[in-house]
Structure formats: C-alpha cells, structure tokens
A protein has these predicted regions:
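Thiol-based oxidoreductase modules, predominantly thioredoxin-like and allied folds used
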Residues: 23-24, 67-96
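Typically the conserved alpha-helix immediately C-terminal to a functionally engaged Cys/Sec
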Residues: 54-70
Length: 146
C-alpha cells in the first residue's frame, strides 16, 4: 500500500513538473533565442508570492498545457519576478537584472504587466491581467505582433 502511494506521488509530481512553463530569466538570452528562431518575446512582470492577479495569470494562462502548446513555437517566454517573501528572495544578480528590465519596460510598476517585444527588444505592445481563456490570451498576444 505504501509503495503504491509513493509511486502515485512521484507520478503526480512529474505531471506537474512536465507542464511547467519554460521561463527564460535573462533578456540577452531571450533575444538570442528569439533571433535564432524568428520569434517575439513575451516579457512578464510579476510578483509571484504577493500579487493576486499575477498568481491568477500564472494559474489560468501560463501554467496551462493549452497555452504552452500554443506558445512554445511562437514566443520566447521571459520572466521578471519581484517576490517579497524572504524565502523566495532572488539571487542578487537576478534581482538587479529584473530591476533594470522594470526601469526600461515597466517604469510605472504595474503588476502583472505583459510586454511583447521583438527579437531586438523593441516594444510591440502590452497587456495586463484579464479573466479569459488561454487560447484567447494567446490570440491577443499574437494580435499585438501584427
């Protein structure tokens, strides 16, 4: 009985891990991938442990297999997280990088704030949180490109 429980827990953990959004956390790396693959960048400013709309956006859009299937060959996903809890503190270098991204792309400090960039980092448009489906949110991101 214990063995079956442990096996089911491992499988459950793997299923959550397999469906996680693949995030890049460095703008230069995102630009390089975007340029190589002829893709645009979706830059997401979020407060992963304090911003309720950010958490909803992650749960309802980014973490869904539906959105991931639609976006994986179309966008490079770049995350700039600003957690507040001590246990979620980012490494200093990453925090400095995120602060620079915020100065450049989110000077008003909106959370969540989704910015679509071209492969060289030019802003094409932006979105915030809205209650919608992963497919409709994806279509809004694509519409920004056009």
């Amino acid at each position: 009985m214990k063995k079956a429980f442990y096996i089911s827990m491992v499988l459950l953990t793997l299923s959550f891990t397999a469906s996680a959004q693949e995030w890049i956390t460095n703008l230069d790396e995102a630009k390089q991938i975007a340029s190589k693959n002829n893709q645009n960048i979706v830059l997401v400013f979020q407060g992963s442990d304090w911003c309720v709309p950010c958490i909803k956006l992650d749960k309802e859009i980014w973490s869904t297999s539906e959105f991931q299937k639609l976006s994986k060959d179309h966008f490079v996903m770049l995350q700039a997280d600003f957690p507040k809890r001590k246990q979620n503190k980012l490494p200093e270098e990453l925090q400095e990088h995120n602060n620079k991204l915020a100065q450049q792309y989110n000077p008003n400090g909106y959370f969540p704030f989704v910015v679509v960039l071209n492969e060289s980092g030019k802003v094409l448009g932006h979105l915030g949180y809205e209650k919608t489906t992963p497919t409709l949110f994806y279509k809004k991101l694509v519409a920004i490109e056009n």
